[in-house]
Amino acid sequence: CYPTFGGSGVVATELGIALSKIGHTIHFITYHQPVRLETLNTDNIHFHEVEIPDYPLFKYQPYELALSSRLVDVVKAHAIDVLHVHYAIPHAYAGYMAKKMLIDDGFHIPIVTTLHGTDITLVGSHPFYRPAVTFSINHSDKVTAVSESLKNDTLRLFDITTKIDVITNFIDIKKIEAKVMPCKRDLLAPKSHKIITHISNFRPLK
């Protein structure tokens, strides 16, 4: 997953934490510790950093190659049962490459790909990326989308031959406390205006 405040990283992290609480061992594999992974003081949550060597030949460092190799290393070292990749680019593609490399070494691991939004509707649908995204989705063992709308967009924008199941995003309501906070609403907007709050990463699209 991406380790940022974006929805894909948050959902991936919270899902992993929730699974760890019911006895599963979770390994997060990304280029930085996820922002929602506040502690590693447990026996069944682990973080593996993807290091990207800086080689002058490359104008852009090949993160997908580094990620694929790291996935292979972690699967072999820790006997991982399943890879769950969040956000189609580049994680689904890297997951597929890791799976193929592992097969050559006698490891057979299923890939679950979760589609989150702009990885499909904005980035993934770009002509430069569409063939790789289509291939990665179709070669995943399981594909989920976070909404019916995203599922429909994926089917509309790509030639998808595999089933997509919808599993909506979630929150842990136990973390939320009902608090009444005094607020001078007129400082934000006139009474006739609605106030909408959006929380995400700080990309121009948002």
Task: Tell where the protein language model's regions lie, with residue ranges.
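N-terminal subdomain of nucleotide-sugar transferases
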Residues: 1-35, 43-48
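A short, basic/aromatic alpha-helical/loop segment that forms part
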Residues: 5-6, 173, 203-206
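Carbohydrate-associated surface elements
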Residues: 32, 149, 170
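An amphipathic, basic-hydrophobic alpha-helix
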Residues: 56-83, 92-97, 127-131, 135, ...
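Nucleotide-sugar donor phosphate/pyrophosphate-binding loop at the beta->alpha transition
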Residues: 103-112, 118-136, 152, 180
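A short beta-strand/loop micro-motif in the catalytic core of glycosyltransferases
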Residues: 138-148
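Conserved donor-binding/catalytic core segment of Leloir-type glycosyltransferases
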Residues: 144, 189-206
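A short helix/loop element that forms part of the nucleotide-sugar donor recognition site in Leloir-type
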Residues: 176-190
